[in-house]
């Protein structure tokens, strides 16, 4: 039997990074 990996149990949708200004990116970073 195949082992269940955490990634398989929790599928994540690949998001395409939108064009973000560097200022906004820096501000977004915590």
UniProtKB/Swiss-Prot annotation:
> What is one GO biological process annotated to this record?
spermatogenesis
Q: Tell me which GO cellular component terms the UniProt record holds.
A: nucleosome; nucleus
| Annotated keywords | Chromosome, Developmental protein, Differentiation, DNA condensation, DNA-binding, Nucleosome core, Nucleus, Spermatogenesis
Q: Name one GO molecular function term.
A: DNA binding
Tissue specificity annotation:
Testis.
Keyword DNA-binding present in the record's keywords: the answer is yes
Region called Disordered, residue ranges = 1-30
Task: Give the subcellular location.
Answer: Nucleus; Chromosome
Primary role: Protamines substitute for histones in the chromatin of sperm during the haploid phase of spermatogenesis. They compact sperm DNA into a highly condensed, stable and inactive complex.
UniProt protein name: Protamine-YII
Q: State the organism of origin.
A: Clupea harengus
